[in-house]
Each structure stands twice: as C-alpha cells, then as structure tokens.
C-alpha cells in the first residue's frame, strides 16, 4: 500500500510539473503576442500621425501582402490614391516618391496586422492539438483570435470612411479600432498574468480589487479619448498648460449643436475632456497608492501600486510635454506607447488580486 501511495503521489507531482511547463510555454507565447501587438499599435499610431492611413485604397487580405515591385506598379498604386479627396484637396502636388513615404507606413501596419494572425493562431493550434492548453482556456483564447479577425474588418471600415467625402478617417471609427486593439491586448495580458505564479498575500483592503478594476477602465477610457484627440487633431487646439490659453475653463466648448456632439466632434472640448480624464486617473492612482501603502506597505500589492503611480506620472509628463511642443511625432508616439504600458500594467495589477488560474485536476490520490 505504501508503494501504491508513493506511486500515486509521484504521478500527481509529475502532472503538476507538466502543467507548470505548459503554462510557462503559453506565458512566453502570450508575451510574444503582447510585444507584437505593442509594435502594431505604435505603427498604427505613426500611420495616423503621418496621415498615411489612406494611401492604400483597397482591401486585399491576401494579395495586399505584396507591395509594388516596379515603377509601373508604383504608378498604378499612386493613380488609385489620386482618386480620393485626400489627394485632390490636400496633396495635389505629391510625387510618386513622396507617395512611397506614406504608403510604406500603411503597408507596414497592414503587414503586421496579418502577421498577428500567424503569431497568435499557429501556436494556439499547436498548443491545442498537443494538449498543452487546458480545455477551459480553449474558448477564451479562441475568442481572442476571432476578435483579431474582427479587428481587421474594423480597420478597413475605418479606412473606408476617408475614401469618399472626407480627407481623413472618422474619429469614431479610429477610436473603435484603437479600443478593440486595446481589448485584445488586455485579454492577452489578463491570461498571461492568470497563468503566472501569484503571491498569497491578502489584498490591502476589501476594496483593492475593485479599485484596481476602476483604474484599468479609466486607463482604457483615456485611450479612447486620446484616439478622439488624434482623429480631430485636437492636440493643436490648446498648447498651453496648466491653463488653456489663460483660462481654467476655456471658451468655445459648446459651439456645436446639439450640445452633446461637442464631446465627440469639437476639438477644443475633446482636448479639455482628455485633460480632465488624465487628472482624474492621476488622482485615483495616487489615492490607491496611499491606501495600499498605509494598509500593507510590505506587500506585493503595495509595491505594484507604487509602480503604477510612477508609470502614470511619467505618462502625464509625456502628455504635457507633447502638448507644449505642439505634438512632435516622436513624442506623440512615446505618449501612445506610455498609454499602452499604463493600461497593460493596470490590467496585470487588477488580475493580481484574483490568484493563479485554477489548475486542471486529472489525478486523485487515494489513501
């Protein structure tokens, strides 16, 4: 009987070790996905800031992987661009060589987006077929893959808004595209953190997890507002801080009718709300840090609250500097990168309060 018990216990240990190896492999894979998503979002930001997003006027998911390879193909691509309002109203003097500059940004963004399907889908299929993914993860991970496919359609829906009557894309569709990318990013971060070892330390207060969730949602809302700012070029509305052209509440916030539309289409109002959102997020993160340090200063949870505060502080400094310098490309992209880092850490911090993802039990030890 002792030998049987020893054998059963060893089998359990072997199974736990196998699950540990599998979870580590999945964490590494999701980490690579997160890095690729991070790069994709930044290239997308550069595409918007350089006004390159309308340079490719067709959606060809397969054939579009291959860029123009000779002078004739470049001219054909340029001729397609000449048909849209952006060229006719803003870029009538553009040459083929200048067109190549904006084309490559949009092509790179689409190429990375297609590559994401391979980076996510192929390893997922391998992990499922070889039994490395626990069954209860099949549905959520498959859902992330499908959301990635939907994101491709949303991207074209966004681009198509600027091909007929506009010289740029709709800020509503731009915000939808960016928020969807962030939801994919958050989902990957959530499950990577869930499959990681967790501290057994109790939360500093009974409200800590809810506060962490609030911070994550506020971070996402700030990214949404930032997309509206980018879509409307609202960063150029006021380039002073802390006042907005000498006023705490500037004029011109409600010049459109109906009044609610100013929150989405008035560049001055959109920048104003983005500032207020930043102040609110900073305040909540600061309060969260103070509460955590007072309640349980030596815990991992408290240390995470300090890191989160520092990240938000850096992001605030980046945002102010970007504003004061009138939105230079390198600072605007750094600010966007900072937003994604803050959001990603906020998601990881939130998930850290719920412990490691329950393990799949397949072996029982008998007395």
Swiss-Prot record:
The keyword Cell cycle does not apply. Its cofactor is heme b. It comes from the Bacteria. GO terms for molecular function: metal ion binding; oxidoreductase activity, acting on NAD(P)H, heme protein as acceptor. It is a multi-pass membrane protein. Its EC number is 1.17.99.9. Keywords: Cell membrane, Heme biosynthesis, Iron, Membrane, Metal-binding, Oxidoreductase, Transmembrane, Transmembrane helix. It is an enzyme of class 1 (oxidoreductase). InterPro entries: COX15/CtaA_fam, HemeA_Synthase_type2. Pathway: Porphyrin-containing compound metabolism; heme A biosynthesis; heme A from heme O: step 1/1. One of its GO terms (biological process) is heme A biosynthetic process. Heme binds at residues 274, 335. One of its GO terms (cellular component) is plasma membrane. Coiled coil: none annotated. It holds the Pfam family COX15-CtaA. It catalyses: Fe(II)-heme o + 2 A + H2O = Fe(II)-heme a + 2 AH2. It is found in: Cell membrane. Belongs to the COX15/CtaA family. Type 2 subfamily. Catalyzes the conversion of heme O to heme A by two successive hydroxylations of the methyl group at C8. The first hydroxylation forms heme I, the second hydroxylation results in an unstable dihydroxymethyl group, which spontaneously dehydrates, resulting in the formyl group of heme A. This is Heme A synthase. It comes from Rhizobium rhizogenes (strain K84 / ATCC BAA-868) (Agrobacterium radiobacter).
């Amino acid at each position: 009987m002792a030998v049987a018990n020893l054998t059963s216990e060893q089998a359990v240990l072997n199974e736990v070790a196998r699950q540990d190896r599998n979870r580590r492999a999945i964490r590494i894979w999701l980490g690579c996905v997160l890095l690729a998503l991070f790069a994709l979002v930044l290239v997308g930001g550069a595409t918007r800031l350089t006004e390159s997003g309308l340079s490719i006027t067709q959606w060809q998911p397969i054939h579009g992987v291959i860029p123009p390879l000779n002078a004739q193909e470049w001219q054909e691509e340029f001729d397609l661009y000449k048909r849209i309002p952006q060229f006719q109203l803003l870029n009538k003097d553009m040459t083929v060589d200048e067109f190549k500059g904006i084309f490559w940004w949009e092509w790179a963004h689409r190429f990375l987006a297609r590559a994401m399907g391979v980076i996510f889908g192929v390893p997922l299929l391998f992990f499922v077929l070889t039994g490395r993914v626990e069954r209860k993860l099949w549905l959520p991970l498959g859902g992330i893959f499908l959301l990635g496919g939907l994101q491709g359609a949303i991207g074209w829906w966004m681009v198509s808004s600027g091909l007929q009557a506009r010289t740029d894309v709709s800020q509503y569709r731009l915000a939808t595209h960016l928020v969807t990318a962030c939801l994919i990013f958050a989902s990957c971060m959530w499950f990577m953190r869930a499959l990681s070892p967790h501290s057994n330390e109790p939360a500093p207060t009974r409200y800590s997890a809810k506060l962490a969730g609030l911070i994550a949602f506020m971070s996402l809302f700030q990214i949404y507002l930032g997309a509206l700012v980018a879509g409307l070029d609202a960063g150029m509305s006021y380039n002073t801080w802390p006042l907005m052209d000498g006023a705490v509440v500037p004029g011109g916030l409600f010049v459109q009718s109906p009044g609610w539309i100013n929150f989405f289409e008035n560049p001055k109002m959109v920048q104003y709300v983005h500032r207020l959102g930043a102040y609110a997020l900073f305040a909540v993160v600061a309060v969260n840090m103070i509460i955590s340090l007072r309640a349980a200063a030596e815990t991992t949870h408290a240390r995470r609250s300090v890191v989160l505060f520092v990240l938000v502080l850096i992001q605030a400094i980046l945002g102010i500097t970007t504003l004061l310098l009138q939105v230079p490309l390198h600072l605007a992209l750094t600010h966007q990168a900072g937003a994604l880092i803050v959001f990603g850490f906020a998601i990881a911090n939130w998930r850290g309060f719920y412990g490691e993802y329950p393990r799949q039990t397949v072996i029982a030890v008998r007395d």
